[in-house]
């Protein structure tokens, strides 16, 4: 991990939030903690604060250096290693390397076979000891009182969910506004629901930055886990009008990581501008029900 050391004291929101991190004006609903990856051990309760609601998002700078990220982008562009490629709905102009559980269109047995191959390819993508599992998950653990972060186990011994997915967003690619907790209502989550708490959050590692757009935008609209169905149920007509909501949008550099209370807060990815693909790794996560670990999936 690289990058100069900075002090990351808990300050009043207006002091803690830097305009370089946000597109638009600071909004008081969003409490942001920013730190350098090398300072993670100074913030061992950061993710606990996020789960409790006193922090809404955490930006970790320089998890990877830009040179390595460019190499990873080159390999992803060449589809090397040959990850399973799946797609968002066509209008989103985006795709996955790996299988997004929310959009899973295969049977569980096939999914867990694909997950085994996916993890092999993921190991090949990064230099030894610098992969998502060995670097990012350990970083998250350091920000969560050293609680282990790992791929959620499958229903049978030796099975596990895909730890993450790599996402490519082409020109015009975007993701509509949603809260992640609503995903748990879908059939693919039936087994996972038996393992984890109802409140999930997520991390996004920016691997390749687009020419413009592709920002993660979070809205001043919060839905508790027990009310997630309100956004997932098409029969509910009183859904939020985004034009009436305050929001913040984050500008990250390649190698930066953001952790967001995406389970409760409405959020989206704004359309990508230009021909440079936006590449990320994205994992969802939630407390194991015994609270001794955090389980992750893509």
Which positions does each model-derived feature cover?
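Generic recognition of flexible, low-complexity loop/linker segments
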Residues: 46, 190-193, 268-270
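Catalytic core of non-heme Fe(II) oxygenases with the double-stranded beta-helix
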Residues: 171-249
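Signature of the catalytic double-stranded beta-helix
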Residues: 105-171, 188, 195
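Short, flexible loop/turn elements at secondary-structure junctions
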Residues: 62-64, 167-170, 181, 205-207, ...
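Extracellular structured ligand-interaction cores
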Residues: 55-57, 161-163, 198-204, 213, ...
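N-terminal auxiliary "cap/dimerization" subdomain that precedes the catalytic jelly-roll/cupin core
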Residues: 1-130
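A structural signal for short, well-ordered beta-strand segments and their strand-loop junctions
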Residues: 58-62, 152, 163-165, 215-218, ...
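Catalytic core of Fe(II)/2-oxoglutarate
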Residues: 228-298
């Amino acid at each position: 991990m690289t990058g100069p050391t900075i002090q990351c004291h808990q300050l009043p929101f207006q002091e803690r939030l830097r305009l370089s991190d946000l597109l638009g004006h600071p909004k008081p609903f969003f409490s942001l903690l920013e730190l350098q990856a090398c300072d993670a051990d100074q913030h061992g309760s950061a993710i606990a604060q996020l789960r409790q609601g006193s922090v809404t998002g955490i930006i970790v700078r320089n998890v990877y250096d830009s040179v390595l990220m460019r190499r990873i982008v080159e390999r992803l562009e060449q589809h090397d290693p040959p990850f399973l490629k799946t797609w968002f709905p066509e209008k989103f102009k985006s795709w996955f390397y790996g299988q997004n559980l929310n959009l899973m269109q295969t049977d569980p047995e096939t999914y867990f076979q694909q997950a085994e191959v996916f993890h092999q390819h993921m190991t090949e993508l990064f230099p030894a000891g610098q992969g998502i599992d060995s670097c990012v998950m350990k970083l998250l653990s350091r920000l969560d009182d050293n609680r282990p972060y790992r791929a959620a186990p499958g229903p049978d011994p030796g099975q596990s969910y895909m730890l993450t997915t790599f996402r490519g967003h082409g020109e015009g690619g975007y993701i509509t506004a949603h809260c992640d907790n609503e995903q748990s209502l879908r059939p693919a989550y039936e087994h996972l629901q038996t393992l984890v708490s109802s409140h999930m959050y997520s991390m996004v590692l920016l691997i390749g930055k687009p020419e413009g757009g592709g920002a993660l935008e979070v809205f001043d609209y919060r839905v508790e886990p027990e009310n997630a169905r309100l956004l997932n149920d098409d029969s509910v007509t009183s859904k939020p009008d985004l034009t009436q909501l305050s929001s913040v949008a984050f500008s990250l550099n390649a190698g930066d990581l953001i952790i967001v209370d995406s389970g409760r807060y409405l959020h989206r990815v704004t359309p990508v501008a230009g021909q440079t693909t936006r590449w990320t790794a994205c994992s969802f996560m939630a407390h194991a029900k015994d609270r001794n670990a955090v389980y992750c999936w893509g």
